[in-house]
A protein has these predicted regions:
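Short, Lys/Arg-rich N-terminal segment immediately upstream of the first membrane anchor
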Residues: 1-5
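Hydrophobic membrane-insertion alpha-helices, especially the h-region
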Residues: 6-24
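Amphipathic alpha-helical segments typified by the pilin-like N-terminal helix
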Residues: 18-40
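N-terminal alpha-helical signal peptides/signal-anchor transmembrane segments
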Residues: 38-59
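Low-complexity, acidic interaction segments enriched in glycine
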Residues: 53-147
Length: 147
């Protein structure tokens, strides 16, 4: 009876040790995967930003859609989709601001939300990141440009 109780206690200790290890390793794994994915997404956003700059120099304003960049041969078709997402496109917003001196100032913002490029990872961690960004007034993901 005494040996059986000792085995049971050892089993409980092992289960608690594994649970403790997982509680520490899960957030670390998420952060590592997030950093890897953000690097890939930022590289793609940089390419889109360069294509937009080229389009703006040619036309005087930014392209209103990624399809326009693809049709003009400035962007490969596959680059308009967010990596790791379920074939979702980057969000794109453009505008032309008129300065007080009357000069036109084209602006654009292209980005991907956390839920897009962190698809398939810990949903609670993604929700926490999104909530934190929204509370601080930041973009809930990564982007280039802005208004």
């Amino acid at each position: 009876m005494k040996h059986r109780l000792n085995y049971l206690l050892v089993g409980c200790v092992l289960v608690l040790a594994v649970a403790c290890f997982l509680s520490v390793s899960r957030p670390l794994t998420f952060e590592r995967q997030r950093a890897e994915r953000e690097k890939v997404v930022m590289e793609r956003l940089h390419i889109i930003g360069q294509a937009q700059e080229t389009y703006c120099r040619q036309h005087g304003h930014y392209a209103e859609s990624l399809d326009t960049l693809v049709r003009n041969g400035l962007l490969a078709d596959s680059l308009q989709f967010v990596p790791y997402s379920d074939h979702e496109r980057f969000s794109l917003r453009t505008t032309v601001e008129i300065t007080p001196s009357g000069r036109s100032l084209p602006q654009m913002e292209c980005g991907a939300h956390y839920r897009q490029y962190l698809h398939g990872l810990d949903e609670a961690a993604i929700g926490s990141l999104t909530e934190k960004a929204e509370q601080t007034g930041d973009y809930p993901g990564v982007k280039v440009g802005g208004f």
